[in-house]
C-alpha cells in the first residue's frame, strides 16, 4: 500500500459516515413512514443539509445544480376498516407517485380484484370504489398495469398488496416503487398482515365499507437540486466523479443513505489526509433517483440523467469515471461485486486482485460484472459518455426481502462491509487519479458483440452477419492494440510517479490527454450505437431483441401449423410487451406501448431511442385466446398475420445488423485517430 493510501485509511472514520447516514433520516414527507421524495420539502431540506456538510468536511466549489422535474409529496395514507369480529383496524399504507386527497376521512366501498387483471373485473362495478389487488412485481407485472386497469374501469384507487417479489421479509412489510404510469391513476400499498382480515370479509361479502384518509400530491414542472462539491485537482478539465442519490422511500438507510455517507466519508478522509489529486474529484449527491417524472416508463434516475445530459453536458469527455454507490453497508452475497461497463472490465479485474483486506463475509472474494444495468444512476452516466460502475447490490436476497420497505433500516447494518467499501473505493479513486489515460478497452465491447453472434441464424435471415463478424473482429483487434498502448502508458506513468519524476510524468500525461478525449469519444459513440433495452429494461445489443422475437415467432407458427393455439400463445407471450395483452384491456396495453414509442425524448430520459421496434399482437392474442376457449382449430387468419409479422421482424433484423456494421465503422474511425497518433 502506498503512503498516500495509508494516510487515507488512517483518516477514515466510518462512525462519522454511519452518523451521517442516520442524520439523513431527519427530513421526511410522511411523519410515520419517512419518504424523502423528488422535489418535496424533505428532499430540498436534505439537499441544503448536504451542501452544508460538504462545506464542513472541506469540499470546495460546493453548489446546488437545479433540475426541472415532477415532484411528489406523500404525507399520509391511512385505511380504517372492521374485521369479521367487529375489531377496528387502522393501517398505515405506503403510496405511489399519484394524486389523491381526501381532506380527512372519507368512506369508500372496497372490492377485491385478485391480481388486478381485466378478467378479475368481469361482473363487477368498481366505479368510485377502492379495489384491492395482490401483485408480484418481480415475477409478473409492474404496479402500473393493474393500477391503470383499475383507472380504466372507473375505480377511485387501487390498493396493492405484495404477494411476493418484494417486501418478503415480514407480512407487515409495505413496499414502494416507481409507478411507471400517470399521476391521475392513484395507488397505495397495504401490507399482507393488514390486508388479510379485510380480504376475508371481501371474499365473504363481496363489498366492504372502509374509511380512507390520504394526501399524496404530484406537481408537474417543479425543481430540485443535485448537490455538488469538489476536491480541486491540478487538472480542472479532467475529473473523477463519485455519486449517490439522496432521495428515498421510507427511511432509506441502505438505499441510499449509507451510499451518500460512503461518498462523503471518502471525501472527508481524502481532505483530512492532505491528498492532492491530479484530476479534480467531484462528489455529487443526486436528487430524484427513485422517481422524477410522471407517466414515463423510464421515470427513475432523473437527477443523474439531467446532471450529465442537461446540466453539465460538458462533463462528457472530461469525466474519466463515475463511481456510483448503492446499498453499500450490507453484504449482498458470498462475493462482493463491482458492476461496470465492458470497457473497464480488464482494469477493474486487475484492481480488485490487489485488494488484500476483503472481509470474511465475502469468502468468494470480489467479482467484476458487466455491463451496467438500468436499476441505478450509473446507467444514465454511461449512456451520456461517462464510463461508470456501481457496487453490486442486486445479487442477494435483500432486493426481495427488505428493499423499498420500512425494513430498510440500520438493523441490517454491517459495519465491516461499510468500512471495507470506504477503503476499497477510496483506493479506487486514487488508482484512477494515477493514470496517464482512461483505461478504456474498446475491444471488449466488440468481443461482447461477437460472443452473442449467430452466423447461421443471420444467414438464414439474409442478414449481413458475416460482414458484422468481420468488422467487429477488426474493431476488436484495433481496440485491443490501443488498449495495450494505454496500459503501457499507465504503467510508465505510475512508475514515474513512484520514482518522484513528476515532470516526466506530466509530459507523459500531456501526451495522452488528447488521446484520452478520443477514447472517451469512442466510448460515447459505442454507447449510442450498441446499448439498447428490451421491454423489461434489460440491456442488450440492437439486434438481440428482434432475434429473440424471430425465434418465438418461428415456434408460434410451427405450433399453429400443428393445430396448437395454446402453445402458440405461450410463444407470443415472450414477444416485446405482448404478455400484457393476455391480462389487461386494450386501453391499458396501448397506453403503456404508446408512451414508449410516441413520447417526447426528454420525457423518456435515459430510455429515449433504446427500444427500436415493436410488434403489436394484441388483436392476434385476443383471437387465439377466443379460439382456444371455443376449441376452434382453424388458424388460417392467424397464420397469415404471423407470417406478416415475421417478415416485418426479419426486415428489422437485417436493418439492425446493418446498423451495427455502420456503428462499428464509426467507432473504428475514432480509434484510428488514436492509432495514427504515435
Residue ranges and their predicted role:
Residues 3-5, 89-123, 176-254, 264-276:
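Soluble metallo-hydrolase cores and metallopeptidase-like ectodomains found primarily
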Residues 13, 38, 91-186, 364-367:
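Extracellular/luminal Protease-associated
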Residues 138-145, 149, 223-226, 248-343:
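Acidic/histidine-rich catalytic neighborhood of metal-dependent amide-processing enzymes
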Residues 222, 328-448:
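Active-site-adjacent substrate-binding region
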Residues 279, 398-450, 569-570, 574, ...:
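His/Asp/Glu-rich mid-to-C-terminal helical/loop segments that flank catalytic regions of hydrolases
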